[in-house]
């Protein structure tokens, strides 16, 4: 028998691993070199960069520039040579050398799908694999490679989701930086207003005290001047009297009648005038309380604020957080609390106990909702809206059955109607309310709506509400004019003074 051609020993394992891409772990295909010196398949490194915001090396993470990829001809030639040797019978396949079956020393040509084991023909006859599905290695490898390809696609999509989420967190961080600066300015402005008010009140109180001191000082000086003049007049009279007493008896007695009349008309000393001391009580008595009461007259208070973190992209909340307009959709920082499928937002407070009331000025808005939403229902509605995508209707999931209780203005073929979130309820009134009063009795399970201008009851819901937050919907304005706002009305603050017993 004629000997076959001699086969040179294959390359070492470490050398073969140097020719594997660090991304796909296959021999290089169109090898390229990055600026950092690492090598990859061109397709692999490009695929990694598709899901990165900033291209970087998959191994060392050094920043990379896609335009600076250099084709590595040496690596490509080495891989081509070794693959050609494989085709000619070389032992290297790019992964591991074929191994025979340990039990039968026969070539492994089959694969048990149930046990996930490589088999030879003798293993197939074993009782352990009699009822199992067995396929040729080549066919199984092809099927598994297809599954891995699908898995690779799933992983790439997951990586894209991770990078998108990372970009969202980056946007949130930047938003918070801007918001922190803005909030610091607003907080300082509000405290400056309080300090200005206190400075004005302090100066007014000090000025009033000094004015009283000036007047009382002038009065005391005037009294002292009068007393000085009267004292001087008495001194002259005393001197005259002394001179008359030195006269001879006849002359002295002749002047006695006029002297007596003159002495009788001298001024008597007036009693000390009351109220000349500074009135400390007038200025110090409950000073802080009196200033605080006066401050209440200039301070505006609302039962709650409009939460901008829940406002959908259509809405813009005013800086004082008491009014909102619909200015058309604009991209906002994503967060789980924000409405995504409708121009809605929530109030800042959570109500679960006690009695609460507030008034809302809806004016002539063509489309609105005012009411409450169960906290858990809001979270569930947001999750369902996210699953449904942007194509959802503005009214999706926002009804009484899903934990939303409200009055709304809707547009119909025969005009506008005032409706409730209960679809089984008929239209309430013909005259559209412009200012609504909402009264929530948590323990009683009642949510009532009133027309504040007409002083009439509109509707009452009866339910176990649980934890709720004020809920609002604001449709787009009609016409080309500036958008009309929805406002939370200010409270009328009163003070009740009681004796602490």
UniProtKB/Swiss-Prot annotation:
GO cellular component, as recorded: cytoplasm; nucleus
GO BP: any one term: negative regulation of cell population proliferation
Catalytic activity field: S-ubiquitinyl-[E2 ubiquitin-conjugating enzyme]-L-cysteine + [acceptor protein]-L-lysine = [E2 ubiquitin-conjugating enzyme]-L-cysteine + N(6)-ubiquitinyl-[acceptor protein]-L-lysine
Signal sequence, start to end: none
One Pfam match: PRY
Purpose of the protein: E3 ubiquitin-protein ligase that participates in multiple biological processes including cell death, glucose metabolism, and in particular, the innate immune response. Mediates 'Lys-63'-linked polyubiquitination of TRAF3 thereby promoting type I interferon production via RIG-I signaling pathway. Can also catalyze 'Lys-48'-linked polyubiquitination and proteasomal degradation of viral proteins such as influenza virus PB2. Acts as a negative feedback regulator of TLR7- and TLR9-triggered signaling.
Name assigned to this protein: E3 ubiquitin-protein ligase TRIM35
Organism taxonomic ancestry: Eukaryota, Metazoa, Chordata, Craniata, Vertebrata
Gene symbol of the encoding locus: Trim35
